[in-house]
Each structure stands twice: as structure tokens, then as C-alpha cells.
Amino acid sequence: MIELSIVIISSKKDYLFSCLTSLESTLRGIENEIILVDNASPDRVGDEAKKKFPQIKVIRREKNGGFGENNNMGMRIARGKYVLLLNDDTEIIDKKIFDEMILWMEEHPKVGVASCGLLNTDKKTLQGSGGYFPTLPRVLAWMTFIDDIPGVDRLIKPYHPLHGWSPFYKGEGYFKSVHKQDWVTGAFFLMRKEAMDEAGLFDEDFFLYVEEVELAYRFIKAGWEIWYLPKWKIVHYGQVTTGSEKAMIFELQNLQLFYKKHMSSWQLPILTFILKLGVVLRIVLYGLTNPSVAKIYIKAYAAI
């Protein structure tokens, strides 16, 4: 029986081969399968990866697909008791990560999704990894910088816990502790297949960004828990696939889509007002300090 299926999306080999190499030594003794979704790479990176790592399965896409759509292709054929979505711009440095995280999930049967600590390229400092569902108060606190005020995020759990001044949820210290969250990032998204089958696959209407939030929402709605486990860590080189301008616009638009699908209709116009308010604040701020960034926010305002 396959214990672990790993789904990786890639369109270039810059990080992929080092990711696959780092997996080899950590999967010894675990019945596993690696499913690589070649996202319409011009140099057919999947074919090259298959030659170097013959044990992997390759799904070739002829057109560029979104994060959720591509992962769904791998998730549909995954046979493992656990299914891991892993970014190709990651490196596995903990040799026992899979043995021990799977054991932890076996000991915690209510957990449907778990993630580990994500290290920056210095292999010391931690990145943010997920947070709490984007309710109106949380989005307001995020878009107006209110959650940067020390103590505020003790009252309002943040949508994006980030580095900041607050001693509670914001700052690297938060990501050093084991805790339950509403959602975790897709860079390392370990699912119990039983829970995945119940919650469903990614909603392919979300091309990029917020898709993990939406899927996590369905996991929790189905009664499963989501945990962040920084005892185990990987390196995430991050932001390799999408520039900041597209990322920003995708996230704001997909927050609106999330509200259309899951929240009461009266909340959407309030969300849109909050998003536009936050964007205007950034246009003013960066207009004084960094005009090129301000131009990005002007485009974002028009997009929402």
C-alpha cells in the first residue's frame, strides 16, 4: 500500500531537480509515489526529470494551468494514504520529516491537513505559513495596517501573520510554536487522503492565490483540523513563479471570489470597500516613497 503521494508542479528545472534530489534520501523506507505535473514547460522539463528520476510519474500539460487546477490533476490519481502538495522551489533538509509527520498525524486522527516550518534561503529564519480565515475584521486590520499595532492581533487573529512589532501573532516567534490554524500555504500541504476525499479538490475558479484558503475552509467545514508543526522544516526559496504585481491582483480578486462563494451576499460590497481603502492607503504611502510600487497598486485598484 502506498503511504505517501507527493504532487509537484513545475514549469522549469531551476529548482525542481534539487527538490527531487532532496526527496530521495528522505523517502527511504516509505512506500511512496511522486507525481510531477509539467505545467506546459517549453523545454519539457517533465521528460528530462523522468530521465533523471525514472521512478516519478509525469503528467504533461500543453497549456499553462493554475495552481489548483494543476494540483487537482495529481491529486485525482494519488493513491497514498497521505497526499503532499510540495512546491518545486523547496528543499527537504530534515531526513525524518515524512516518517515523523505521518506518525504525528496517525496519532492525531482529527487532523486533515498539516504543514511544517518554512525556512528562508539563509536556512535559519522562518517565513510566514498561512493564518486565519479572511473575515471582514481581519481583512480590515490587514489592509489598514491596524494589525501592525502591538496587541491588536491578540484581539483579532490575523489573516496573514507576518513579521511585525506585535508580541502576539505577528513576528517569527509565532511561527516557532505548534498550533492550530485556519489555513496553511500550499508550499507544503500534507493531507490525509480520507479528509481530502471528503473536502474535495481545489476549486479551479481560483487560478492562483487564496485557493489554499478556500480548500482549507472546506476541510474545516467538514470537521477536520489544520495544524502548523514547526518542529519539522524545509527550505522554501519562494516567489519563484509569480511576480509581486500579479500576485497582489490575484489575491485581492480571489478574496472577492471567496466571499462570493462562501459568505453572505451583504458582505461582498463591504469587503470590496475595505480592499479599495487599503489599496488607496498604499497608493498614497508609496506615492511618497516608491512611485513604481504605487503604480502597481493603481493597477490593483482598477482590477477590483
Show where each model-derived region lies.
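Conserved donor NDP-sugar-binding/catalytic core segment of glycosyltransferases
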Residues: 94-129
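A short, conserved alpha-helix in the catalytic core of glycosyltransferases
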Residues: 173-233
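Short, flexible, basic/aromatic active-site loop/helix in glycosyltransferases
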Residues: 134-181
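Active-site-adjacent helix/loop segment of glycosyltransferases
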Residues: 119, 216-293
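Glycine-rich, basic loop-to-helix element that forms the pyrophosphate-binding segment
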Residues: 61-78, 100
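Short, well-formed alpha-helical segments that are part of the catalytic scaffolds
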Residues: 12-27
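A conserved acidic beta->alpha catalytic loop
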Residues: 22, 38-47, 63, 91
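Short aromatic/hydrophobic "clamp" motif used to bind/position activated sugar donors
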Residues: 83
